[in-house]
Amino acid sequence: LNANLSTRYEAPAVKAFNFAEKSGMLYYITAGDKAEEKPGLYLLNTETGVKTLIKEGDGVFKQVTFDEDGANLAFLYCAQKDSCYKAMSLWLSQQGAPATEVAARGNRAFPKGWVISEHGKLQFSKSASRLFFGTSPEPRQKDTLQLAENRPNVQVWSWDEPVQYTVQDYNKEKELKRSYQAVYHINGGRICQLADEELSQILLGDEGDAPLALLSTSRPYSLSSMWEGRTRSDYYTVS
C-alpha cells in the first residue's frame, strides 16, 4: 500500500520479498497464477508503481540481494531443485532491467571442478561496483541407491593429523557448507577467485571497495596449536 499514491499492490502466491535499504524498491518471488502473473522474481518500484519481471522461472531463487540504494539486484538461480548443489548460477539486474546471467558452473576464473555455492554470502560493495559471492568444490552426493545398513561406517584418524578427529566431527556440517570468496567486477564484467582451500579466510576493507583484500591461513600451524595453546596464521594480500 502506497499512501502517497493511494495505490494498493497485490501479488499472488508470494514466496519471499524484501525492500532495498534506502529506497522504495521491493523484490518478490511468486509462484504466479494462471491468469495474470508468471512465476519468477519481480521488482516493484513502490514510488512509481512500475513492476518488472526480472527473471521468469519456477526454479530455486536464493540469496536475493539489493545494493544499498536498490539500483542493482543480484541472486542465485537454479532451474532444478535437486541440482542446486552443483548448478547454481549468478544473475544481476541493473537499474530495474531484466536480469542477465553473469557467472555459472565452468567459469574460467574458478578452479577446475568448482561451482557457485548456494551457501556463500552474496553482497555488493559499498559503491556497488563489485559483487561478492561464494564458490566451492562440487559437493559429493550420497549414493541413494544403496541402503544405509549396507554402507560401511568406518572412521579412520591418525594421531598426526593437523586437526583432531573430535574437532573434525564437531565442524563437519560447517565444513560441508564452506565456500570461498569470489568477486564479479560489475563495470568490467570480470570475475576473480579471491580465496581458495589453501587461503580460505578473507578480510575486505573499505566495505568491499579497497584495492586490496587480506587473506590468511592457520593450516601450517594446526598441529602445533594443539600443544602451544594458540593459533598462528600467515597473511597475504590480493588485489
Give residue spans per PLM region:
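Beta-propeller folds
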Residues: 1-239
